[in-house]
């Protein structure tokens, strides 16, 4: 079985693949201060009896990645391991001004989106940031857009407005909020829906083609049911990309 690890700024998602099927997955908080030993103890507890035969990792948090590397070498010694970083063979041409700026998670999403849906495609990843990644018909990474994630926007508003507070992120009864809580929920949910729909429409116009869209990330379910432009939901798109890149780097050439 293959262990895939996607280290994000807020959460780390782990998945275990049996062949090309995702057998199990977990979401835990990312703690850049966690040591390799602590991570090994946590991951072994989650994995239980899953017989791990390889590891594939991507990270947007450099401090966490250092300890993940140590954890893998101690907990899964001598196993085939792929860490996605500049120079890793992904099969994805990166057509931006500085290819080294492209986050590993964005390249994994590009790889998986083209594998599953072909192209052109637009990936919208709802996490700490809302990342929009554009994939060409040939599977090239063309760039995209960043916006604050829903939780980041809510935290910022609650911290700067004296009479506002964090609320549960759920769809309110109506767009017109009848309480402070509902007004916040409306602004957060429908605000992001409008933002994403507007960006997708502009990107499609710039591409000159009705590119398919794929929503992923932990907060995608909140948005996709209200969106007019999000066609598909792949909750584990990044993990699928990690499986594909592992295969590209471990299969005999």
From Swiss-Prot:
Known cofactor(s): NH4(+); K(+)
Per the record's keyword annotation, is Manganese included, yes or no?
no
* Catalytic residue positions: 105 (proton acceptor)
**Catalytic class of the enzyme:** transferase
**InterPro entries in the record, alphabetically?**
ATPase_NBD (IPR043129), Type_III_PanK (IPR004619)
Subcellular localization, per the record?
A: Cytoplasm
Catalysed reaction, written as an equation: (R)-pantothenate + ATP = (R)-4'-phosphopantothenate + ADP + H(+)
Binding locations of ATP: 6-13, 128
Pathway membership: Cofactor biosynthesis; coenzyme A biosynthesis; CoA from (R)-pantothenate: step 1/5
Positions with a binding annotation for K(+): 125
Q: How is the cofactor bound?
A: A monovalent cation. Ammonium or potassium.
Alphabetized GO MF terms: ATP binding; metal ion binding; pantothenate kinase activity
One Pfam family of this protein, by short name?
A: Pan_kinase
Positions that bind substrate: 103-106, 180
The biological processes this protein is annotated with in GO are: coenzyme A biosynthetic process
Q: Which cysteines are joined by disulfide bonds?
A: none
Broad class of where this protein is predominantly found: cytoplasm
Family in the record: Belongs to the type III pantothenate kinase family.
What biological function has been recorded for the protein in this entry? Catalyzes the phosphorylation of pantothenate (Pan), the first step in CoA biosynthesis.
Q: What is this protein called?
A: Type III pantothenate kinase
Task: Please give the organism.
Answer: Parafrankia sp. (strain EAN1pec)
Gene encoding the protein:
coaX
């Amino acid at each position: 079985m293959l262990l895939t690890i996607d280290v994000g700024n807020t959460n780390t998602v782990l998945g275990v693949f049996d062949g090309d099927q995702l057998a199990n997955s977990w979401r835990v908080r990312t703690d850049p201060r966690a040591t390799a030993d602590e991570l090994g103890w946590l991951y072994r507890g989650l994995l239980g009896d899953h017989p791990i035969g390889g590891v594939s990792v991507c990270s947007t948090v450099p401090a966490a990645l250092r300890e993940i590397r140590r954890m893998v070498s101690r907990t899964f010694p001598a196993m085939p391991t792929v860490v996605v970083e500049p120079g890793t063979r992904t099969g994805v041409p990166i057509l931006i001004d500085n290819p080294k700026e492209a986050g590993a998670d964005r390249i994994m999403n590009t790889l998986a989106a083209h594998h599953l849906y072909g192209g052109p495609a637009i990936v919208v990843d709802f996490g700490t940031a809302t990342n929009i990644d554009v994939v060409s018909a040939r599977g090239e990474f063309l760039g995209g857009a960043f916006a604050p994630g829903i939780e980041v926007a809510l935290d910022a508003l609650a911290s700067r407005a004296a009479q506002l507070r964090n609320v549960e992120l759920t769809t309110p009864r109506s767009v017109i909020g009848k309480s402070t809580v509902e007004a916040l929920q409306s602004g957060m949910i429908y605000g992001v829906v409008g933002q994403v729909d507007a960006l997708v429409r502009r990107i499609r116009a710039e591409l000159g083609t009705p590119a398919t869209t794929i929503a992923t990330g932990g907060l995608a379910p909140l948005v996709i049911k209200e969106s007019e432009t999000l066609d598909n939901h792949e909750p584990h798109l990044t993990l699928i990309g990690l499986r594909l890149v592992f295969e590209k780097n471990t299969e005999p050439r």
